[in-house]
């Protein structure tokens, strides 16, 4: 029974729960790795060893957080749980493929862990650039195992993307047009399209790297007519859409949370929100070389990538101001989920502003590969994606489990996390402006003060993570069941109660159009 339910599951709710648990566990591993990084950088001098082992930790931290925490939780967890409920579908379009998408991830994770256990580990950074990732600088199986790990995670995501696109287009009630589906459903569909179009390019790039390493091809070796810059183009053609893949489902969740706790029946500017997400998705594909301003591209090429990157700020601004407009005149309930959403809006906007700074190719020459970049993408990921995940988690926790979290603990947890992440990453802007480079385990002692403060912040964040584990335990131990959920008429996922039955919408749902 246990095996049939959890190993061979074809139920979107159970698979969503598996994704959530796996993502939470991977999040703990990723947090542990980040604590190792900040412990090493907490003061000058060496703690862990040389820069190779340090970069293995940094690389693993990135891969674990991106491919095994944010994506499984946002797309696999929230996506699986909420999309069928929100569109009134009985399940996903391909329930067994859904199960395979999940079970490809643990082996993928295993390969990534194995890569650090053999030889010297893969100390390449998450970008895996040759020639550093070639078989000379990284002899042995480490990088090969990392490449196989990425292949599996990529296949998992591509299958999941096909599943979500098919489900969302094909399994709505006949009366519902695409423009009547909730914004979270839109965000997942756009994310799935981005995955479907970008991951094959990554697969091509890392497969060529694999053959360069093992079969003496020279795709990225100038000695045989190849070019390492080609790898960078292939990687970032995936890598830039990837960062939008990480944030778009968060946009969808924040739209729902802000609308719900403002007491509104719909978000401000629904069509504008949809248009903005589609614009971000499209523009995300034509700005990749802003990661490569230092490789010596023509000035006109740099001018194009600078201006195209800045254009993304417009639809992003549409979203930020629409969230603020949604709250305007509302009866705002200061619930923990709303606090996460407000923290998201504030901190994501700061991260966006530093992104605008970095989009200037002239400035990026100086700031590239400094801690300014680290601060920028951790503001949008560690305080964008993660805050959205936390907000979504405390908002939909009653739906997933039938129990309620303790409001006071949840607010304390938010406060500790808010202080921790800001204390960790705000000083890194100063380090970057002062020229401290990334991916080094040691630094001149002029950088000590801000690094020490940053490391203190990371330990505050760690206490927040531990408190969250306690908070979830407390909810399951206390068993406070949900009495009633307000506003269900505009929040379809709640209509079956908390938690919903194993099978929902078994009969086709006919929903009367408001027009």
Curated annotation (Swiss-Prot):
Binding site for Mg(2+): 368-369
EC number(s) per entry: 7.1.1.9
Stored CDD domains: Cyt_c_Oxidase_I
Topological domains, Mitochondrial intermembrane: 41-50, 118-140, 213-227, 287-298, 358-370, 434-446
Keyword annotations from UniProtKB, A to Z: Calcium, Copper, Electron transport, Heme, Iron, Magnesium, Membrane, Metal-binding, Mitochondrion, Mitochondrion inner membrane, Respiratory chain, Sodium, Translocase, Transmembrane, Transmembrane helix, Transport
Residues binding O2: 244
Cofactor(s) needed for function: heme; Cu cation
Membrane-traversing stretches: 12-40, 51-86, 95-117, 141-170, 183-212, 228-261, 270-286, 299-327, 336-357, 371-400, 407-433, 447-478
Residues annotated for Na(+) binding in this entry: 40, 45, 441
Cofactor binding description: Binds 2 heme A groups non-covalently per subunit. Binds a copper B center.
InterPro entries according to UniProt: Cyt_c_oxase-like_su1_dom, Cyt_c_oxase-like_su1_sf, Cyt_C_Oxase_1, Cyt_c_Oxase_su1_BS, Cyt_c_oxase_su1_dom
Protein name, as recorded: Cytochrome c oxidase subunit 1
Organism: Heterogeomys underwoodi (Underwood's pocket gopher)
């Amino acid at each position: 029974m246990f095996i049939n339910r959890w190993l061979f599951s074809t139920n979107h709710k159970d698979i969503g729960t598996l994704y959530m648990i796996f993502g939470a566990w991977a999040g703990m591993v990723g947090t542990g790795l980040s604590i190792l990084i900040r412990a090493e950088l907490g003061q000058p001098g060496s703690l862990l060893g040389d820069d190779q082992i340090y970069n293995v930790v940094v690389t693993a931290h990135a891969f674990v957080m991106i491919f095994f925490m944010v994506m499984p939780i946002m797309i696999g967890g929230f996506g699986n749980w909420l999309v069928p409920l929100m569109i009134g579908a009985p399940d996903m379009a391909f329930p067994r493929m859904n199960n395979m998408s999940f079970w490809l991830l643990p082996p993928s994770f295993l390969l990534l862990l194995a890569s650090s256990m053999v030889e010297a580990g893969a100390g390449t950074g998450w970008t895996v650039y040759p020639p550093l990732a070639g078989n000379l600088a990284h002899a042995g199986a480490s990088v090969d195992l990392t490449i196989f790990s990425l292949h599996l995670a990529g296949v998992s995501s591509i299958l999941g993307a096909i599943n979500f696109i098919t489900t969302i287009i094909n399994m709505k009630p006949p009366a519902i047009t695409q423009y009547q589906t909730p914004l979270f459903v839109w965000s997942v569909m756009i994310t799935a399209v981005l995955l479907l179009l970008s991951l094959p390019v990554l697969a091509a790039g890392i497969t060529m790297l694999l053959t360069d390493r093992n079969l003496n091809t020279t795709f990225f070796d100038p000695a045989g007519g190849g070019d390492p810059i080609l790898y960078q183009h292939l990687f970032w053609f995936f890598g830039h859409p990837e960062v939008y893949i990480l944030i778009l489902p968060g946009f969808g969740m924040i739209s729902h949370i802000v609308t719900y706790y403002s007491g509104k029946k719909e978000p401000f500017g629904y069509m504008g929100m949809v248009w903005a997400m589609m614009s971000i998705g499209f523009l995300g594909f034509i700005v990749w070389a802003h990661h490569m301003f230092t490789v010596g591209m023509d000035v006109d090429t740099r001018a194009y990538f600078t201006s195209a990157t800045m254009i993304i700020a417009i639809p992003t601004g549409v979203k930020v101001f629409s969230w603020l407009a949604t709250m305007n005149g509302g009866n705002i309930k200061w619930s923990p989920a709303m606090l996460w959403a407000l923290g998201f809006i504030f901190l994501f906007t700061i991260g966006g502003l530093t992104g605008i700074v970095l989009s200037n190719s002239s400035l990026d020459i100086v700031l590239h590969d400094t801690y300014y970049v680290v601060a920028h993408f951790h503001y949008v990921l560690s305080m964008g994606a993660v805050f959205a995940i936390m907000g979504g988690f405390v908002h939909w926790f009653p739906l997933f489990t039938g129990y309620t979290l303790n409001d006071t603990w949840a607010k304390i947890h938010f406060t500790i996390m808010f202080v921790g992440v800001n204390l960790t990453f705000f000083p890194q802007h100063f380090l970057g402006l002062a020229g401290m480079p990334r991916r080094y385990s040691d630094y001149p002692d002029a950088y000590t003060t801000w690094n020490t403060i940053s490391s203190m912040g990371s330990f505050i964040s760690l206490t927040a993570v531990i408190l969250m584990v306690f908070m979830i335990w407390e909810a399951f131990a206390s068993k406070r069941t949900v009495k009633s959920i307000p506003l269900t008429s505009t929040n379809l996922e709640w209509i079956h109660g908390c938690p919903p039955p194993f099978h929902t919408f078994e009969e086709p749902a006919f929903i009367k159009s408001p027009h």
